[in-house]
Amino acid sequence: MAATLGRDQYVYMAKLAEQAERYEEMVQFMEQLVTGATPAEELTVEERNLLSVAYKNVIGSLRAAWRIVSSIEQKEESRKNDEHVSLVKDYRSKVESELSSVCSGILKLLDSHLIPSAGASESKVFYLKMKGDYHRYMAEFKSGDERKTAAEDTMLAYKAAQDIAAADMAPTHPIRLGLALNFSVFYYEILNSSDKACNMAKQAFEEAIAELDTLGEESYKDSTLIMQLLRDNLTLWTSDMQEQMDEA
Protein backbone atom coordinates (compact mmCIF):
# COMPACT_ATOMS: atom_id res chain seq x y z
CA MET A 1 0.00 0.00 0.00
CA ALA A 2 1.21 3.52 -0.68
CA ALA A 3 2.30 5.20 2.55
CA THR A 4 -0.32 7.94 2.43
CA LEU A 5 -3.48 8.09 0.40
CA GLY A 6 -5.90 10.94 -0.18
CA ARG A 7 -9.02 11.18 1.92
CA ASP A 8 -11.28 9.81 -0.82
CA GLN A 9 -8.90 6.91 -1.35
CA TYR A 10 -9.01 5.98 2.33
CA VAL A 11 -12.81 6.00 2.18
CA TYR A 12 -12.68 3.77 -0.89
CA MET A 13 -10.20 1.37 0.75
CA ALA A 14 -12.30 1.24 3.93
CA LYS A 15 -15.37 0.29 1.86
CA LEU A 16 -13.31 -2.31 0.00
CA ALA A 17 -12.09 -3.82 3.28
CA GLU A 18 -15.69 -3.83 4.56
CA GLN A 19 -16.87 -5.73 1.48
CA ALA A 20 -14.05 -8.25 2.01
CA GLU A 21 -15.01 -8.45 5.72
CA ARG A 22 -11.46 -7.49 6.69
CA TYR A 23 -12.50 -5.22 9.54
CA GLU A 24 -9.09 -4.80 11.22
CA GLU A 25 -7.84 -3.27 7.96
CA MET A 26 -11.00 -1.19 7.68
CA VAL A 27 -10.12 0.23 11.12
CA GLN A 28 -6.58 0.99 9.95
CA PHE A 29 -7.76 2.86 6.85
CA MET A 30 -10.20 4.96 8.87
CA GLU A 31 -7.59 5.66 11.56
CA GLN A 32 -5.19 6.88 8.88
CA LEU A 33 -7.93 9.09 7.45
CA VAL A 34 -8.64 10.60 10.88
CA THR A 35 -5.03 11.16 11.93
CA GLY A 36 -4.13 12.49 8.49
CA ALA A 37 -6.95 15.06 8.50
CA THR A 38 -6.13 18.49 9.88
CA PRO A 39 -7.50 18.74 13.46
CA ALA A 40 -10.17 21.28 12.55
CA GLU A 41 -11.52 19.06 9.80
CA GLU A 42 -14.72 17.27 10.72
CA LEU A 43 -15.55 13.85 9.29
CA THR A 44 -18.47 13.62 6.87
CA VAL A 45 -21.47 11.50 7.93
CA GLU A 46 -20.28 8.75 5.59
CA GLU A 47 -16.74 8.77 7.05
CA ARG A 48 -18.09 8.83 10.59
CA ASN A 49 -20.32 5.83 9.89
CA LEU A 50 -17.49 3.87 8.24
CA LEU A 51 -15.31 4.45 11.31
CA SER A 52 -18.11 3.31 13.60
CA VAL A 53 -18.87 0.17 11.53
CA ALA A 54 -15.18 -0.78 11.37
CA TYR A 55 -14.72 -0.64 15.14
CA LYS A 56 -18.12 -2.17 15.88
CA ASN A 57 -17.24 -5.27 13.85
CA VAL A 58 -13.79 -5.70 15.39
CA ILE A 59 -15.02 -5.20 18.95
CA GLY A 60 -18.18 -7.25 18.27
CA SER A 61 -16.31 -10.43 17.41
CA LEU A 62 -13.98 -9.98 20.41
CA ARG A 63 -16.89 -9.42 22.82
CA ALA A 64 -18.61 -12.53 21.46
CA ALA A 65 -15.38 -14.53 21.87
CA TRP A 66 -14.97 -13.27 25.44
CA ARG A 67 -18.53 -14.28 26.37
CA ILE A 68 -18.06 -17.79 24.96
CA VAL A 69 -14.69 -18.29 26.69
CA SER A 70 -16.06 -16.95 30.01
CA SER A 71 -19.01 -19.32 29.85
CA ILE A 72 -16.69 -22.30 29.16
CA GLU A 73 -14.54 -21.18 32.09
CA GLN A 74 -17.57 -21.29 34.41
CA LYS A 75 -18.48 -24.78 33.18
CA GLU A 76 -14.94 -26.05 33.76
CA GLU A 77 -14.93 -24.50 37.24
CA SER A 78 -18.19 -26.22 38.12
CA ARG A 79 -16.66 -29.52 36.94
CA LYS A 80 -13.61 -28.81 39.15
CA ASN A 81 -11.38 -29.38 36.12
CA ASP A 82 -8.40 -27.32 37.34
CA GLU A 83 -6.09 -28.03 34.43
CA HIS A 84 -8.69 -26.85 31.91
CA VAL A 85 -9.65 -23.87 34.08
CA SER A 86 -6.05 -22.68 34.04
CA LEU A 87 -5.82 -23.01 30.23
CA VAL A 88 -9.14 -21.21 29.70
CA LYS A 89 -8.15 -18.38 32.08
CA ASP A 90 -4.95 -17.78 30.10
CA TYR A 91 -6.91 -17.76 26.87
CA ARG A 92 -9.47 -15.34 28.32
CA SER A 93 -6.62 -13.01 29.33
CA LYS A 94 -5.39 -13.02 25.74
CA VAL A 95 -8.85 -12.03 24.45
CA GLU A 96 -9.06 -9.35 27.16
CA SER A 97 -5.76 -7.79 26.15
CA GLU A 98 -7.03 -7.60 22.55
CA LEU A 99 -10.28 -6.02 23.79
CA SER A 100 -8.30 -3.47 25.83
CA SER A 101 -6.13 -2.63 22.85
CA VAL A 102 -9.09 -2.02 20.50
CA CYS A 103 -10.96 0.07 23.09
CA SER A 104 -7.85 2.13 23.88
CA GLY A 105 -7.28 2.73 20.16
CA ILE A 106 -10.69 4.25 19.47
CA LEU A 107 -10.82 6.12 22.80
CA LYS A 108 -7.48 7.77 22.01
CA LEU A 109 -8.74 8.74 18.54
CA LEU A 110 -11.95 10.17 20.04
CA ASP A 111 -10.13 12.25 22.67
CA SER A 112 -7.31 13.50 20.46
CA HIS A 113 -9.11 14.11 17.15
CA LEU A 114 -12.81 13.38 16.83
CA ILE A 115 -14.39 15.06 19.87
CA PRO A 116 -12.22 18.24 19.71
CA SER A 117 -13.00 18.73 15.99
CA ALA A 118 -16.75 18.07 16.29
CA GLY A 119 -18.67 21.27 15.58
CA ALA A 120 -22.28 20.23 15.05
CA SER A 121 -24.32 18.90 17.99
CA GLU A 122 -25.06 15.72 16.04
CA SER A 123 -21.32 14.97 15.69
CA LYS A 124 -20.64 15.76 19.35
CA VAL A 125 -23.39 13.41 20.52
CA PHE A 126 -22.26 10.71 18.07
CA TYR A 127 -18.66 10.77 19.34
CA LEU A 128 -19.51 11.16 23.04
CA LYS A 129 -21.91 8.22 22.73
CA MET A 130 -19.13 6.25 21.04
CA LYS A 131 -16.76 7.18 23.88
CA GLY A 132 -19.34 5.92 26.38
CA ASP A 133 -19.83 2.70 24.40
CA TYR A 134 -16.12 1.77 24.41
CA HIS A 135 -15.68 2.58 28.10
CA ARG A 136 -18.75 0.37 28.70
CA TYR A 137 -17.15 -2.47 26.73
CA MET A 138 -14.11 -2.10 29.03
CA ALA A 139 -16.39 -2.29 32.08
CA GLU A 140 -17.83 -5.58 30.77
CA PHE A 141 -14.61 -7.51 31.28
CA LYS A 142 -12.57 -5.48 33.80
CA SER A 143 -12.83 -6.06 37.54
CA GLY A 144 -12.19 -4.16 40.77
CA ASP A 145 -10.94 -0.57 40.46
CA GLU A 146 -10.48 -0.84 36.70
CA ARG A 147 -14.15 -1.74 36.28
CA LYS A 148 -15.16 1.11 38.58
CA THR A 149 -13.10 3.61 36.56
CA ALA A 150 -14.47 2.31 33.25
CA ALA A 151 -18.04 2.62 34.57
CA GLU A 152 -17.40 6.19 35.79
CA ASP A 153 -15.92 7.16 32.42
CA THR A 154 -18.92 5.60 30.65
CA MET A 155 -21.31 7.61 32.81
CA LEU A 156 -19.48 10.89 32.14
CA ALA A 157 -19.46 10.40 28.37
CA TYR A 158 -23.10 9.29 28.12
CA LYS A 159 -24.20 12.12 30.42
CA ALA A 160 -22.37 14.74 28.33
CA ALA A 161 -23.95 13.28 25.16
CA GLN A 162 -27.39 13.20 26.78
CA ASP A 163 -27.21 16.88 27.80
CA ILE A 164 -26.45 17.98 24.22
CA ALA A 165 -29.01 15.58 22.69
CA ALA A 166 -31.80 16.77 25.01
CA ALA A 167 -31.07 20.41 24.15
CA ASP A 168 -30.44 20.18 20.42
CA MET A 169 -31.93 17.01 18.94
CA ALA A 170 -35.48 15.77 18.34
CA PRO A 171 -36.59 12.80 20.50
CA THR A 172 -37.02 10.84 17.25
CA HIS A 173 -33.43 11.43 16.06
CA PRO A 174 -31.76 8.02 15.61
CA ILE A 175 -28.54 9.15 17.35
CA ARG A 176 -30.47 10.44 20.38
CA LEU A 177 -32.52 7.21 20.47
CA GLY A 178 -29.38 5.08 20.09
CA LEU A 179 -27.82 6.93 23.00
CA ALA A 180 -30.87 6.25 25.21
CA LEU A 181 -30.74 2.58 24.18
CA ASN A 182 -27.07 2.15 25.09
CA PHE A 183 -27.24 4.32 28.22
CA SER A 184 -30.16 2.24 29.53
CA VAL A 185 -28.26 -1.00 28.77
CA PHE A 186 -25.34 0.42 30.79
CA TYR A 187 -27.65 1.03 33.76
CA TYR A 188 -29.08 -2.48 33.50
CA GLU A 189 -25.98 -4.56 32.75
CA ILE A 190 -23.09 -2.67 34.34
CA LEU A 191 -24.71 -0.78 37.24
CA ASN A 192 -27.47 -3.35 37.91
CA SER A 193 -29.97 -0.48 38.19
CA SER A 194 -33.03 -2.10 36.64
CA ASP A 195 -35.41 0.71 37.60
CA LYS A 196 -33.16 3.43 36.15
CA ALA A 197 -32.69 1.39 32.96
CA CYS A 198 -36.43 0.84 32.51
CA ASN A 199 -37.30 4.47 33.23
CA MET A 200 -34.74 5.75 30.73
CA ALA A 201 -35.84 3.36 27.97
CA LYS A 202 -39.53 4.06 28.65
CA GLN A 203 -39.07 7.84 28.61
CA ALA A 204 -37.07 7.76 25.35
CA PHE A 205 -39.66 5.50 23.72
CA GLU A 206 -42.64 7.60 24.85
CA GLU A 207 -41.04 10.92 23.86
CA ALA A 208 -40.30 9.53 20.39
CA ILE A 209 -43.82 8.10 19.99
CA ALA A 210 -45.27 11.52 20.84
CA GLU A 211 -43.33 13.10 17.97
CA LEU A 212 -43.50 10.27 15.47
CA ASP A 213 -45.24 12.48 12.90
CA THR A 214 -42.13 14.71 12.74
CA LEU A 215 -39.96 11.83 11.51
CA GLY A 216 -38.29 12.49 8.19
CA GLU A 217 -38.35 9.73 5.60
CA GLU A 218 -34.56 9.33 5.60
CA SER A 219 -34.31 8.44 9.29
CA TYR A 220 -37.71 6.72 9.68
CA LYS A 221 -36.28 3.20 9.36
CA ASP A 222 -33.35 3.82 11.73
CA SER A 223 -35.49 5.52 14.37
CA THR A 224 -38.30 2.96 14.38
CA LEU A 225 -35.77 0.10 14.56
CA ILE A 226 -34.15 1.60 17.68
CA MET A 227 -37.59 2.27 19.19
CA GLN A 228 -38.39 -1.41 18.68
CA LEU A 229 -35.14 -2.36 20.46
CA LEU A 230 -36.00 -0.03 23.36
CA ARG A 231 -39.39 -1.71 23.64
CA ASP A 232 -37.89 -5.21 23.42
CA ASN A 233 -35.48 -4.39 26.25
CA LEU A 234 -38.30 -2.95 28.36
CA THR A 235 -40.35 -6.12 27.90
CA LEU A 236 -37.39 -8.34 28.77
CA TRP A 237 -36.26 -6.28 31.77
CA THR A 238 -39.71 -5.93 33.31
CA SER A 239 -40.33 -9.69 33.01
CA ASP A 240 -36.90 -10.39 34.58
CA MET A 241 -37.70 -8.00 37.44
CA GLN A 242 -41.09 -9.67 37.90
CA GLU A 243 -39.44 -13.11 38.09
CA GLN A 244 -36.96 -11.86 40.70
CA MET A 245 -39.79 -10.40 42.77
CA ASP A 246 -41.71 -13.68 42.53
CA GLU A 247 -38.64 -15.63 43.67
CA ALA A 248 -38.11 -13.22 46.56
From Swiss-Prot:
Pfam families per record: 14-3-3 (PF00244)
Induction or repression = By cold.
Its annotated function is as follows: Is associated with a DNA binding complex that binds to the G box, a well-characterized cis-acting DNA regulatory element found in plant genes. Specific negative regulator of slow-vacuolar (SV) ion channel. Mediates F-actin dynamics possibly through inhibiting ADF1 phosphorylation. Negative regulator of freezing tolerance that modulates cold-responsive C-repeat-binding factors (CBF) DREB1A and DREB1B proteins stability by facilitating their ubiquitin-mediated degradation when activated by CRPK1-mediated phosphorylation in freezing conditions; this processus is counteracted by B1L.
Keywords of this protein's UniProt record, alphabetized?
Answer: Cell membrane, Cytoplasm, Membrane, Nucleus, Phosphoprotein, Stress response
Q: Which family does it belong to?
A: Belongs to the 14-3-3 family.
Where this protein primarily resides, as one coarse class?
nucleus
- Give the recorded effect for residue 214 to A: Reduced phosphorylation by CRPK1. Impaired phosphorylation and loss of translocation from cytoplasm to the nucleus in response to cold
Official protein name in the record: 14-3-3-like protein G-BOX factor 14 lambda
Note the SS bond partners: none
Native organism = Arabidopsis thaliana (Mouse-ear cress)
Record's comment on post-translational modification: Transphosphorylated by SERK1.
Name of the coding gene: GRF6
Annotated membrane-spanning segments are: none
| Consequence recorded when altering residue 193 to A | Reduced phosphorylation by CRPK1. Impaired phosphorylation and loss of translocation from cytoplasm to the nucleus in response to cold
Report the coiled-coil segments. Answer: none
